[in-house]
Amino acid sequence: MRKLILAAASIAAWAVAGSASAQSPIVIKFSHVVASDTPKGKAADKFKELAEKYTNGKVKVEVYPNSTLYKDKEELEALQLGAVQMLAPSNSKFGPIGIKEFEVFDLPYILPDLKTLRKVTGGPLGGRLLKLLDSKGMTGLAYWDNGFKQMSANKKLIAPADYKGLKFRIQSSKVLEAQFRTLGAIPQVMAFSEVYQALQTGVVDGQENTWSNIYTQKMHEVQKYITTTNHGYIGYVVVVNKKFWDGLPADIRDELSKAMKEATEFGNSQSARENDDALEAIKKTGKSQILTLTPEQDEAMRKAMMPVYKEVASRVGQPLIDEFLKETGRSPIN
C-alpha cells in the first residue's frame, strides 16, 4: 500500500506542477471515509462549492467520500506523502502518528454539550492543539463536528456488566481501548468501512458511533439494540498537506481560508440536526430497538468509566486533561 501511495504522490506532484505551468486549476484532493450525507460529507461538499466560487475557478476541489480513495488507516500517510492534499480525520487518528494530545477528546463524558466544545476548540487550547500538527507535515485548518456517540450491540446494554466479554469495534485510540477494557469488553481496532460487515458476520458484537454514522452506514440493520449514552464525542480536524498549503499563492490561501471558515460554520450548525434526523429515521425502520438509560443507570455508566482518566493520564498528559476539564466546567474526576 505504501508503494501505491508513493506512486500516487508522484503523480499528484507532477499534476500540480503541470497545472501551474499551464495555468490550469490547482487541484485539491479531499478524501474522507464517511458518506456524503453525513455532517462531514456535507461540510466537505460545501467547502468544494465555496472554494471553487471564491477562487473563480483557480482551484478545483475533488471530494472522495466513503473511503473511495483511502481507508482511514491509510489516509494520513497519503496526506503526508502528498498523494492527497486535504483530509478531515477524527481526533482519534492523530494518536497513532505521535500526537497523543488529540486523544483527550476521546475521554468518556468529558464534553457535556456542543456549546462547551466550541469554547474549547475556538479558544487558545484548540489553537495550540492544531499547532502540534505542524511537526507532522500538516496544517490544521478547522474543527468539524459529527456528534455524540451511542452504544450498539445484539444484546441490551443497560448496566456496565452488560459489556463484559463483548467484542467492540473501536477507532485506533488508546483511550478508547482503555474505555472498553474498563467495562470488561474486548476492543478491536477496525477501519470504518469494515464495520458493517464485521457486525453482520459477528466478527465484532457491537460498536460506538453517532446517529448519523449508524444510519448512513446501515449499522442499525445488523444491531438489535442501540443505547442512547452520549458517552463520548466524535469530531474531526480538517488538515492540509503543509508543503502544499505553504506553497499556494497568498491570495488563493486567503480565499480557501474564507471558504473553510464558512464551510465549518455550515457543517457545525447542522450536525445536531443531522443526528436528530438520523435517530428518527432509525426509529422508523423498526430494525433496532432504541434504549434510554434512567438517571441512575447513566450515573452507573459514568462511574464505571472514570478509571480511564487515571489510566491514560501519562499518555495524554495530566496537565492537558486538567486544562480541558477546567475549560469544559467539569470537576476533576478521580
Task: Label each PLM-derived region with a short phrase.
Residues 1-4:
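Positively charged n-region of N-terminal signal peptides that target proteins for export
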Residues 23-116, 124-334:
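N-terminal secretory/targeting leader peptides
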Residues 7-15:
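Bacterial N-terminal signal peptides
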Residues 17-19:
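N-terminal signal peptide c-region/cleavage motif recognized by signal peptidases
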